[in-house]
């Protein structure tokens, strides 16, 4: 709540409504947020035929909405400035580009715009009732609940849940993008989004320590970077307004990345972020569907597998890069050492591709214990995926400021890609790593016995 309060102090004036040829998202001013707004919901339809010019529709006039097609509703959340969401247009265009569908923007800016968050929160059920009235008319015209998909951002995620509850969980799918936490944390299932609200509920948690919901809410819950501080977002209040909203918005930007085919973000089901970082959760156990779940639009490839689980809920973790397309590429670095005594320390690994590109991973979340003839498997994360690795460097460090410098004697090092398990494993034998000295070498193909 503290971050939410600070957010309000950074609000700046935005432009008021103006007449436009094509209907667009309601644009209000900060003055509207201060004096408050009554609830008014506009439904704006976009199709492949009308991708940039919306058509305002309602329960008595469905317009050009094709009830035989998939219909995706986008529901925004709290708007303390009255301005349109910066991501809305891109999300609409990206959805239409991947599949022929109806995209309906649920514009409840008159209602969500207020500096008093509880006032916006109190209107969520009213918005849900309006959406149910509209969907009832869709069903009367021949639509199927199976083809209804709701993407809810922040408060919008709970609105989607309330709609799903009114249809006894028969909606096709709900995606919650960092569902709002304040006033919803700890509430019973009927007062928030939960897995029973749709046939498939997937959730991305990106700001669990401030504006987002802490606990799992779906059949599968994704936690980028543990669901806390997101790379690329300001770490202090000196980052201005971005400090307060960047982590919260990152769920939307990560979802957008899944629609844009720059890379596929893979997540790893795990009990905790710490276990994931320690490399304990890289086998997903669902090879008959996909090796591991993908974040975002294609997360429902895992729905049948999750339905068979008891309970049908899974947490999945992954890390991201600071900038688009946010992908991190995972490798295992398997090290067998032959020191007489245990060596504890950290490994930094660099890869150089045949094209000259270099990428680095610091495996430093906690020290590893290297014991004689025991294999230590380290999960390394790189911002770049190198198809052909020409050179590898390793650096061993105990991070000790005083005391002797140690050696790590490596009997065998093996590098294997998790994203591309079909790639050949690369090895190197009989290395001596001097502490804090980078050691370069050319890898060779591992023998078949060690694949």
From Swiss-Prot:
Record's catalysed reaction(s): 1-hexadecanoyl-2-(9Z-octadecenoyl)-sn-glycero-3-phosphate + H2O = 2-(9Z-octadecenoyl)-sn-glycero-3-phosphate + hexadecanoate + H(+)
Cysteine pairs bridged by disulfides in the record: 233-246, 270-281, 284-292, 427-446
MF-aspect GO terms: carboxylic ester hydrolase activity; heparin binding; phospholipase activity
A biological process from GO: lipid catabolic process
Entries under SUPFAM superfamilies matching the protein: alpha/beta-Hydrolases (SSF53474)
CDD domains from the UniProt entry: Pancreat_lipase_like (cd00707)
Pfam families documented for this protein: Lipase (PF00151)
Cellular localization per UniProt: Secreted; Cell membrane
Gene Ontology CC terms, in alphabetical order: extracellular space; plasma membrane
Active site: 154 (nucleophile), 178 (charge relay system), 248 (charge relay system)
InterPro entries in the cross-refs: AB_hydrolase_fold, Lipase, Lipase_LIPH, Lipase_N, TAG_lipase
Name of the top EC class for this enzyme: hydrolase
DNA repair is among the record's keywords: no
EC number(s) recorded for this UniProt protein: 3.1.1.-
Keywords per UniProt: Cell membrane, Disulfide bond, Glycoprotein, Hydrolase, Lipid degradation, Lipid metabolism, Membrane, Secreted, Signal
Main location: secreted
Glycosylation sites: 66
Oligomer and partners: Interacts with TTMP/C3orf52.
Function: Hydrolyzes specifically phosphatidic acid (PA) to produce 2-acyl lysophosphatidic acid (LPA; a potent bioactive lipid mediator) and fatty acid. Does not hydrolyze other phospholipids, like phosphatidylserine (PS), phosphatidylcholine (PC) and phosphatidylethanolamine (PE) or triacylglycerol (TG).
Family to which this protein belongs: Belongs to the AB hydrolase superfamily. Lipase family.
Name of the protein this chain belongs to: Lipase member H
Lineage of source species: Eukaryota, Metazoa, Chordata, Craniata, Vertebrata
């Amino acid at each position: 709540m503290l971050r939410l309060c600070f957010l309000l102090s950074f609000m700046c004036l935005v432009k008021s409504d103006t007449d436009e040829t094509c209907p667009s998202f309601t644009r209000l001013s900060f003055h509207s947020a201060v004096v408050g707004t009554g609830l008014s919901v506009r439904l704006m339809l976009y199709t492949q035929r009308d991708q940039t010019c919306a058509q305002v529709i309602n329960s008595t006039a469905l317009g050009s909405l094709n009830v035989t097609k998939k219909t995706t509703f986008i529901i925004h959340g709290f708007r303390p400035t009255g301005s349109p969401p910066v991501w809305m247009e891109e999300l609409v265009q990206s959805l239409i580009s991947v599949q022929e569908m109806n995209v309906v923007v649920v514009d409840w800016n008159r209602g969500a715009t207020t500096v008093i968050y509880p006032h916006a929160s109190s209107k969520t059920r009213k918005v849900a009732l309006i959406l149910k009235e509209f969907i009832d008319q869709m069903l009367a015209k021949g639509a199927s609940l199976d083809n209804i998909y709701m993407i809810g951002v922040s408060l919008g995620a709970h609105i989607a849940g309330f709609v799903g509850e009114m249809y006894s969980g028969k909606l096709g799918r709900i995606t919650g993008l960092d569902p709002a936490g304040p006033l919803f944390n700890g509430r019973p299932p009927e007062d928030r989004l939960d897995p029973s609200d749709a046939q498939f509920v997937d959730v991305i948690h990106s700001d669990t320590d401030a504006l987002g919901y802490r606990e799992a809410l779906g059949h599968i819950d994704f936690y980028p970077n543990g669901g806390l501080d997101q790379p690329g977002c300001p770490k202090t209040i000196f980052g201005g307004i971005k400090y307060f909203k960047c982590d919260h918005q990152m769920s939307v930007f990560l979802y957008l990345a899944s629609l844009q085919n720059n890379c596929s973000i893979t997540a790893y089901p795990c009990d905790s972020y710490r276990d994931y970082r320690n490399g304990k959760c890289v086998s997903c156990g669902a090879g008959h569907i996909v090796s591991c779940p993908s974040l975002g639009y294609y997360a429902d490839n895992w729905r049948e597998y999750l339905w068979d689980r008891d309970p049908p809920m899974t947490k999945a973790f992954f890390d991201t890069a600071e900038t688009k397309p946010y992908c991190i590429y995972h490798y295992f670095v398997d090290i067998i050492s032959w020191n007489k005594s245990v060596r504890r320390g950290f490994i930094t690994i660099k890869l150089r591709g045949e094209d000259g590109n270099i990428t680095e991973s610091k495996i430093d979340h906690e020290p590893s214990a290297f014991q004689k003839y025991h294999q230590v498997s380290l999960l390394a994360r790189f911002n770049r995926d190198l198809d052909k690795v020409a050179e590898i460097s390793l650096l061993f460090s105990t991070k000790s400021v005083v005391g002797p410098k140690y050696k790590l004697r490596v009997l065998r090092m093996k590098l294997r890609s998790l994203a591309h398990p079909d790639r050949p494993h690369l090895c190197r034998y009989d290395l001596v790593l001097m502490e804090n000295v980078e050691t370069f070498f050319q890898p060779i193909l591992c023998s078949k016995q060690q694949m």
